[in-house]
């Protein structure tokens, strides 16, 4: 004969009396009179264990709004400081600082303008590189490169570096002298840290073994880190009889690296003169 056991009606299935828990909870929610530390008005506060409100509902909400606003202002200030820093590091020359697609010169090649504007508006670090070419001066190559630089910098707020190719080479040469503050690695790291590098007048100087090696290093760094570059040049990509081409100035290796970055994006602006 089997015995059947049943729980007492006043006992929970866990085998214990839970009334002490509800009692503790009710005690934990006791209310007491407090004086608000802000407005000094008396209010009824809920006691939650050792924690008790020090501010009335109105002042507490006011303090919360103040804290949220303080965080928002601090975040905005950080963004402003970052923006100022990347603008200073961009090194856009004064002549080109105000250049943009809205104030561009009349007479620019419509096709080149359209491609440059589309490139700037859709720019990302995954964008291919871009070359503006014309054998003549004054066709708007640097103008469009500056439009791209300013849009990417000020609208997209992406770090860029704008340099004359000759100035970049001179900066690197200066590191060879004793007592310089910067090393060659410092200069190249600046070139690499910019998410967009704009190099103006590439190939303008007569070539040398050092010059070709330096161009190769610059473009190779951009390839390795998959970062785009916008180049202007008055030297053709393909050589013709008796003509100095870009490879003659920067070397076959550097040109190969540049063309790999460009993926065929070479804008020919030959025949224009906006001056």
PLM region spans:
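A short, basic N-terminal segment
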Residues: 1-111, 266, 275
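Pre-Walker A (pre-P-loop) alpha-helix and adjacent loop at the N terminus of AAA/AAA+ ATPase modules
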Residues: 90, 103-131
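Short glycine-rich substrate-engagement loop in P-loop NTPases that contacts/grips substrate
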Residues: 107-114, 135, 139, 149-193, ...
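Walker A/P-loop nucleotide-binding motif
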Residues: 126-146
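Loop/turn-to-beta-strand initiation segments
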Residues: 128, 158-159, 193-196, 225-231
């Amino acid at each position: 004969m089997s015995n059947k056991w049943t729980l007492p009606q006043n006992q929970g299935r866990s085998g214990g009396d839970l009334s002490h828990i509800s009692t503790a909870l009710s005690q934990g929610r006791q209310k007491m009179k407090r004086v608000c530390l802000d407005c000094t008005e008396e209010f009824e506060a809920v006691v939650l264990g050792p924690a008790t409100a020090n501010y009335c509902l109105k002042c507490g909400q006011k303090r919360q709004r103040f804290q949220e606003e303080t965080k928002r202002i601090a975040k905005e200030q950080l963004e402003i400081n970052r923006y100022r820093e990347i603008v200073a590091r961009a090194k856009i020359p004064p002549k080109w600082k105000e250049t943009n697609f809205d104030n561009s010169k009349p007479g620019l090649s419509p096709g080149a303008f359209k491609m440059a504007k589309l490139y700037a508006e859709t720019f990302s670090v995954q964008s291919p590189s871009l070359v503006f070419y014309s054998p003549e001066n004054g066709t708007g190559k640097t103008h469009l490169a500056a439009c791209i630089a300013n849009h990417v910098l000020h609208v997209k707020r992406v770090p860029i570096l704008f340099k004359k190719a000759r100035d970049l080479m001179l900066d690197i040469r200066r590191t060879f002298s004793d007592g310089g503050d910067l090393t060659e690695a410092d200069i190249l790291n600046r070139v690499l840290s910019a998410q967009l590098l704009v190099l103006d007048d590439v190939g303008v100087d007569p070539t040398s073994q050092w010059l070709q090696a330096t161009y190769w290093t610059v473009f190779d760094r951009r390839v390795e880190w998959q970062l785009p570059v916008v180049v202007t040049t008055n030297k053709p990509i393909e050589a013709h009889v008796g003509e100095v081409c870009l490879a003659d100035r920067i070397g076959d290796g550097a040109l190969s690296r540049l063309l790999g970055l460009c993926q065929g994006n070479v804008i020919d602006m030959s025949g224009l003169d906006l001056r």
